Amino acid sequence: MLLLKISVYAVVIFFVGLFVFGFLSNDPSRNPNRRDLE
């Protein structure tokens, strides 16, 4: 069960890091007319 818990935490951290990296690399200041954030 410990290995399963570590695997789940690794996947969650991976997806959170991927989301944060994608959000930071996609700078909203370059796209002031974005309407998908409303």
From Swiss-Prot:
GO terms for cellular component: photosystem II reaction center; plasma membrane-derived thylakoid membrane. It comes from the Bacteria. It is a single-pass membrane protein. InterPro entries: PSII_PsbI (IPR003686), PSII_PsbI_sf (IPR037271). Disulfide bonds: none annotated. The chain crosses the membrane at residues 1-21. Keywords: Membrane, Photosynthesis, Photosystem II, Reaction center, Thylakoid, Transmembrane, Transmembrane helix. The keyword Thylakoid applies. It is found in: Cellular thylakoid membrane. The keyword Mitochondrion does not apply. GO terms for biological process: photosynthesis. Belongs to the PsbI family. One of the components of the core complex of photosystem II (PSII), required for its stability and/or assembly. PSII is a light-driven water:plastoquinone oxidoreductase that uses light energy to abstract electrons from H(2)O, generating O(2) and a proton gradient subsequently used for ATP formation. It consists of a core antenna complex that captures photons, and an electron transfer chain that converts photonic excitation into a charge separation. PSII is composed of 1 copy each of membrane proteins PsbA, PsbB, PsbC, PsbD, PsbE, PsbF, PsbH, PsbI, PsbJ, PsbK, PsbL, PsbM, PsbT, PsbX, PsbY, PsbZ, Psb30/Ycf12, peripheral proteins PsbO, CyanoQ (PsbQ), PsbU, PsbV and a large number of cofactors. It forms dimeric complexes. This is Photosystem II reaction center protein I.
